[in-house]
Amino acid sequence: AKQKQDMNDLMVNELYIAASSDAEGNFELTRNHKLFQANYLMGAGDYRAALNSYKELNSLFEQNQQFWSNPPIYYLSVLEGVLGSLRSVGNYNEIPYFLEKLRKLIAEDSSLEFKVNATCLLFQYELFPYLDKGNFAECTELMSRYQETLYDKEAWLSPIRKSELLLYTTLIHIGNQNYKAAKKYISNAIIDHNIKYLPLMRTIRLVRLIAYYETQEFELIRHESRSITRSLSSPKEQTFKTEHTVLWF
């Protein structure tokens, strides 16, 4: 109850600051206010109101293109946050609305690097409704449609985007029981030293173990298991039941 009251107090205070600072005429302040409001409503479980706030936030960006960075990295990150929130609550029906905004953003920007990284994000959120439900036939078809615009240009991807692409591609191949292809993709997922502590990297290492097991690469399993065990033994590292289960198995 106290935490809920604290959040309510924070919300009231944020609204007061926005109102007293002439938020309507200030893009950055209004943007931050809308983003806070949407995240607050999502955290409070009012998903319908949160969705409306996300749409208002998107409209704000569309009406203030003169304030965008070049390329529009911040707008892209906002769209990614919205899509991630919708996926987290299983609201797949609203994802296409924001995917259309993402497609428009990709079409209008001239930077190849930005286009490819944004296309990777587009691919992921077209993929998740199928992947999350285990519809691997649709996943495979979607992969083929993105061969030219994404897979053939993966050299332009940031380390995180490339790692995400390789991980989800591996999961599709595992779902199709195509374990050799799964091993090929997950083996190419480099543990970049700049991002090796992200949860994504730990997921990649566990999926790599699964691919090695299915292809009977037992020496690689022993090597990778020892490496993961060493990293998990650090007092700074939080470990999860899934990790212990996979390593024990």
Regions found by a protein language model. Give the residues of each.
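"A position-specific structural signal for the A-helix of alpha-solenoid helical repeats
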Residues: N32-F36, Y74-G84, A118-F128, D132, ...
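Amphipathic helix-loop-helix modules that constitute alpha-helical solenoid scaffolds
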Residues: A1-S21, E28, S233-F249
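C-terminal structural cap/anchor segments
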Residues: H173-L247
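Alpha-solenoid helical repeat architecture
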Residues: E24-R31, Q66-S77, D109-F123, K153-L165, ...
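Amphipathic alpha-helical segments of tetratricopeptide repeats
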Residues: V12-D22, K55-F67, L99-S111, E141-A155, ...
